[in-house]
């Protein structure tokens, strides 16, 4: 079974924060690579527990994925993002 998802990495002070917006998981590390590694570990542990409970497919559906053959694919796809600036009152 396969699942493709997005990872965002942010630097906050001396730490790096890795987020998966589609799955609503987050982790941190001292480096970008460590934060990503920790995030993968969190996702794997959570998915194993959900699979044992029989709730994994339901969770993925709530996160906006649907099962197609041997993969879960997003129902919607991010096509871009922008950094904008507005004037505050």
Residue ranges and their predicted role:
Residues 1-4, 37-89:
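Short, charged, surface-exposed hinge/linker loops at domain edges
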Residues 23-33:
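A short, exposed loop/beta-hairpin motif centered on an aromatic-Gly-Thr core
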Residues 17-19, 28, 37:
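Short acidic, gly/pro-rich beta-turn/loop elements at beta-sheet edges
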Residues 3-22:
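Short aromatic-glycine-(Arg/Gly/Cys) micro-motifs in beta-strand/loop hairpins
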Residues 22-25, 78-80:
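Residue-level preference for alpha-helix termini and adjacent loops
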């Amino acid at each position: 079974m396969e699942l493709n998802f997005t990872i965002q990495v942010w630097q906050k002070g001396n730490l790096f924060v890795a987020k998966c917006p589609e799955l609503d998981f987050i982790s941190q590390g001292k480096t970008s690579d460590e934060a990503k590694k920790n995030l993968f570990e969190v996702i794997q542990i959570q998915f194993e527990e959900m699979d044992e409970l029989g709730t994994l497919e339901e969770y993925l559906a709530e996160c906006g994925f649907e099962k197609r053959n041997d993969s879960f694919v997003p129902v919607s796809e991010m096509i871009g993002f922008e950094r904008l600036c507005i004037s505050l009152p």
